[in-house]
Amino acid sequence: LRTIAGLRPPRLTGGSVRVAGEDVSALPSYQVARRGVSLVPQGRRIFGSLSVEENLQIVARPTGAWDLGRVYELFPRLVERRRQAGWTLSGGEQQMLAIGRSLMTNPRLLLMDEPSEGLAPAVLDLILDRLGQLRLQGQAVLLAEQNVDLALAVADRVCVLGEAGTIAWSGPPATLRDAPAVLAELVGL
């Protein structure tokens, strides 16, 4: 994900990163972001000293479908907390804010690194529901997730990484769901 977002160069063994057909492998991260790639990093990384609303507004693009109202519609709890500093939010609220902040950039591609990490079951269910809503709305999401149930529930396509970052398996989630032996071999379940 960090390579796709322009935060790390592609491996020396070759390869490239393309966004809408354009090779962005050598571009700095801010130029990759301008081309519509947004990252929700592992660990959330919100601006703790800024309010919820300031966190959202600081990255907002003036044009596009995502604005404060739409983010607040997706995550109503953020409306209640809009004047609170980011550091005062629970882990789940911080994750909602991190996702909302990325959406405010109106991304073509939303990268999400371990969005379920450290979340309570009720919050995890909410995030799962919202990822499903984003999927239905046509938002492209690339998810790196160790929670297999979550990944299989929201994905259109699954890639399981093997040795040295190679793709060990790729296909529709139903194929893995219907083949527990294959799933166990690939991910050790």
Model region roles, listed by residue range:
Residues 1-189:
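Glycine-rich phosphate-binding loops of nucleotide-dependent enzymes
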